[in-house]
Amino acid sequence: MKNKNENKEKNPLLLLKRLLSYIIKNYKLACFMVVVCILVSALTTLCGTLFIQKLIDNYIVPLTQMAVPDYSPLAQALLKLVAIFAVGVLCSYGYNRIMVNVGQGTMKKLRTEMFTNMESLPIRYFDTHAHGDIMSVYTNDIDTLRQLISQSIPQVLNSLITLVSTFVSMIVLDIPLTIVSVIMVAIMLFVTSKLSAASGRYFVEQQKDIGKVNAYIEEMMEGQKVVKVFCHEQESLEQFKQINNKLRESANNANKIANITMPINGNIGNISYVLCALVGGVLALSGFSGLTIGTLVAFLSLNKSFTQPVTEISQQVSSIVMAMAGAGRVFDLCDEVPETDEGDVELVNICYDSNGEIHETEEQTEMWAWKKPNAANKDEMYTRLQGDVTFDGVDFGYNPDKIVLHDIKMFAKPGQKLAFVGSTGAGKTTITNLINRFYDIQDGKIRYDGININHIKKDDLRRSLGIVLQDTNLFTGTIMDNIRYGRLNATDEECMAAAKLANADGFIKRLPDGYNTVLTGGGANLSQGQRQLLAIARAAVADPPVLILDEATSSIDTRTEKLVQRGMDALMTGRTSFVIAHRLSTVRNADCIMVMEQGRIIERGTHDQLMEEKGRYYQLYTGKSISA
């Protein structure tokens, strides 16, 4: 998926403009104070430099001509100079302190915006982007903005103010020497622009390569057991070396160009200083221009102040270019198009009055209905949530040009248990993903209690579904917190009841801290079966009318499977259930079994009916070949 600003925002100047606008929008007062402090700091530096002329011509030179020198005027002048520089130091401290706060605050806001937008992205986005690369945006890319905001931006602003004010002062002192200085600064700016353009594309590559390294490390950490089982440590290391070497090359290319910018400009600045000293010395000695010693010394100081900002800007170029590469990736994530949701039907709590009419209520009644805001009258506004699910001629493909489900037709009445069986890749899990609207179909309709699910708000649709995914995901926190994740307002007693229903209560109580046992690393301190039981308990506490069990017992041992199955049978009672299992014994009691092959339903019926037909289901169940 491409974001709406992908092409436009690759321009570094537009990225910088957007970032500056973002900072000013959120920190108007702080930015104003920073500009004032930088302005005062730059002017105090300039005043100090110009004061040197008066110090030499009006105080030091007259002292050399006095028989009895009076140093008190000189001392007073020096005190004024110290006061000027003290104000500059305080202002420098002030704007640096403020910019640190602005930088950290901006990074916090951007991380929050990225995370908020990321949570609204469709599942398809995460299918096509490496998780480690996304993590790199939150860490490496966002960190490139820290130095830009807290150091580079104020430094560049300070340098620009110094450059302009110094230029005006130089013109006042001596125009010929100013021309020499301007020519040398123009050369410095030309060199800086060429070198920064050359290094810019390498910094973009560097940030991408950092993301690839992070993605590979994250993948290897998740698959470390598989790596060790197949003894592929050396192969993994070699592959990492290739990715890491590519990062080294892009970083080396970027930094070797950026790092020579400052030395080159520094030497050009020194040449400018020497030329001004030579030309100024000749003019002063000839008496042609009326240059005094104080004016020449002051101008040479101004020359340093004129070339130094360009050198300082060139020093910040690498940080700015790298930050723009990072900012591009940050704004790319912020600009990713969220999951579309055009539904308007809501899931609401209801109660019945004495006349048997439905009324919406804020109380938790455990009775739910679909609310249609555009209904013609009140009788049609509410549809009781029952769990009736129908597929009518559904076609779907993860890519529009490659359909993986063909003309799927089925219905599940409230309380029925439907099972999907078939070989790997037949499309079983895909069907459950469509019920959740993790993906939208290409053709056909899916109806929930007679309502097209495209008309139901996605959040409300998903709240009505309980899900046990193929991969059990647990979060850092206590066991109680993980069970309560199914319904955040559930009480401890309700969570414990759900655990008992899932037959998880027994092993939980045997843990040292029981329900307060802290899980870390996705529940790595629990067995696979225990994690599966907690996932089932989490679905149970949500108390949904429809359950989706994707390979719920495919990864646990036979003994635990029997334990889970008893809990699941109790949980599925009275609920519409969609079950996917490779172990066909777990779905024998299903009301209807759908046999899938290459995205089509090729057989359907009860276990006994399908066994009598001796078709594909019979082959899967018995392991026997179908006789011709």
Language-model features: locations:
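Membrane-integrated ABC transporters
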Residues: 1-45, 60-79, 95-99, 103, ...
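Juxtamembrane helix-loop junctions of ABC transporter transmembrane domains
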Residues: 6-12, 36, 44-60, 84-131, ...
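An intracellular "coupling" helix at the cytosolic face of ABC transporter transmembrane type-1 domains
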Residues: 25-28, 123-124, 142-149, 153, ...
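Transmembrane helices of ABC transporter permease
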Residues: 26, 30-40, 84, 90, ...
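Helix-loop-helix
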Residues: 62, 169-183, 253, 257-328, ...
